[in-house]
A protein has these predicted regions:
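Short amphipathic alpha-helical molecular recognition features
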Residues: 24-32, 65, 69, 118
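Beta-strand/loop motifs with alternating small/hydrophobic and polar/acidic residues, enriched
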Residues: 2-3, 38-42, 46, 57-66
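N-terminal signal peptide
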Residues: 11-30
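Compact beta-sheet-dominated globular domain cores
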Residues: 85-163
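Short, flexible/disordered secondary-structure transition segments
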Residues: 8, 46-54, 91
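Exposed beta-strand-loop-beta-strand "reactive/processing" segments of non-cytosolic proteins
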Residues: 53-93, 104
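Classical eukaryotic N-terminal signal peptides for Sec-dependent ER targeting/secretion
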Residues: 1-10
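Short, non-transmembrane alpha-helical segments in secretory-pathway proteins
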Residues: 25-52
């Protein structure tokens, strides 16, 4: 009986964590959700990816609004594998896997009127967390800082973001 109760509690915890992650995603501002969606599209396009991934949590968010509906976004976040296969349409029942490492993603891009601009090309860098080195993290941030938009524009990481 105790084993059944334990199994029920663990199952409820897994379902709640999946629901909390979906809630965390839905609470992101729209301009950040579009970046997460872009990273997920690139991730599932790789043939080696077998599972569906969901947004897990934000590590760092930074944005600059320059006016005239132009903005620059930097977002560092985790994706987590689910037990659902790649290509799953209804992800509401997808429970997180705890046997796969998190994927650490950093993305920076320019927006105009709430849409991601094609130029300059958005930068998306996602890697399994254990493989991510401090040098790689520095390279990511440097790349986003030096993305050349137009002379005189602010850089993405010039503002102080929120965690």
């Amino acid at each position: 009986m105790a084993a059944l109760l334990l199994l029920l509690l663990v199952s409820a915890g897994v379902l709640l964590s999946s629901i909390e992650a979906q809630e965390a995603y839905s609470q992101l501002p729209d301009n950040y959700r579009k970046g997460v969606d872009l990273a997920l599209q690139q991730l599932i396009s790789h043939s080696g990816v077998r599972y569906h991934y969901l947004f897990f949590k934000s590590l760092l968010k930074s944005d600059i609004e320059l006016g005239f509906d132009v903005g620059y976004i930097y977002h560092n976040f985790y994706l987590k594998a689910t037990k659902c296969g790649k290509g799953t349409v209804d992800v509401t029942q997808c429970k997180f896997r705890d046997d796969r490492p998190l994927i650490d993603c950093a993305i920076c891009y320019k927006t105009f009127a709430g849409e991601i601009e094609k130029e300059p090309k958005p930068y998306v860098h996602c890697l399994h967390k254990p493989a991510l080195t401090e040098d790689m993290k520095t390279t990511r941030v440097d790349h986003c800082r030096t993305m050349s938009y137009q002379s005189g524009d602010s850089t993405i990481l010039a503002s102080k973001g929120s965690k």
